[in-house]
Amino acid sequence: MSGKSLLLKVILLGDGGVGKSSLMNRYVTNKFDSQAFHTIGVEFLNRDLEVDGRFVTLQIWDTAGQERFKSLRTPFYRGADCCLLTFSVDDRQSFENLGNWQKEFIYYADVKDPEHFPFVVLGNKVDKEDRQVTTEEAQAWCMENGDYPYLETSAKDDTNVTVAFEEAVRQVLAVEEQLEHCMLGHTIDLNSGSKAGSSCC
């Protein structure tokens, strides 16, 4: 891959057993292990990609979903560029816990502007037949909690896995572009000492 690569840190968050490790491994190694164990603490993998002409190194952090590992995972939230809130469509409780994960991340990552932070919501395990959460319910949650993109994925059969991580990159790039636009539009007239132009920040 040629050209300067942008390093982006992405955090996978959600209850234990929703398939965060499987999503990461499917995306980076294109492998699926049905016997995978729960993550203890954190793990991360890198993958280089190109999205809309931008070269990116995606650093994907997979976190332990169990409450007893909270002290191990939360220090790694800082510096994250995007958060993938993940639940399993066949586990109602994992969906209902999304709000708690969102709040935990915002607090421990010290997010300064939660309304504009790029969250992406993933409904994983769509290969399962006994789903407990409908697409419409998940989309409604996303609209109510920040108008987040929602994607349904399956690490097992590789449904929307690449699309999900590329969407995360697009969300980060969109926020950065908006910030750059704000800074360019917010200029200072040195002669008068007053600010000229407009700001969208």
Curated annotation (Swiss-Prot):
Task: State the compartments where it is located.
Answer: Cell membrane; Cytoplasmic vesicle, Phagosome membrane
Keywords linked to the UniProt accession: Cell membrane, Cytoplasmic vesicle, GTP-binding, Hydrolase, Lipoprotein, Magnesium, Membrane, Metal-binding, Nucleotide-binding, Phosphoprotein, Prenylation, Protein transport, Transport
Write down the PROSITE patterns for this protein, in alphabetical order: RAB
Q: How does it sit in the membrane?
A: Lipid-anchor
MF terms (GO), sorted A to Z: G protein activity; GDP binding; GTP binding; identical protein binding
Q: Tell me which residues bear Phosphoserine.
A: 34
Q: Which EC number(s) does the record attach to this protein?
A: 3.6.5.2
Sequence positions that bind Mg(2+): 21, 39, 62
- According to its record, what are the GO cellular component terms? cytosol; late endosome; lysosome; phagocytic vesicle; phagocytic vesicle membrane; plasma membrane
User: What is the first-listed, main subcellular location in coarse terms?
Assistant: membrane
GO BP annotations of the record are:
protein transport; Rab protein signal transduction; receptor-mediated endocytosis; retrograde transport, endosome to Golgi
The record comments on the domains as follows: Switch 1, switch 2 and the interswitch regions are characteristic of Rab GTPases and mediate the interactions with Rab downstream effectors. The switch regions undergo conformational changes upon nucleotide binding which drives interaction with specific sets of effector proteins, with most effectors only binding to GTP-bound Rab.
Would you tell me the protein name for this molecule? Ras-related protein Rab-9B
Q: Can you name the source organism? A: Pongo abelii (Sumatran orangutan)
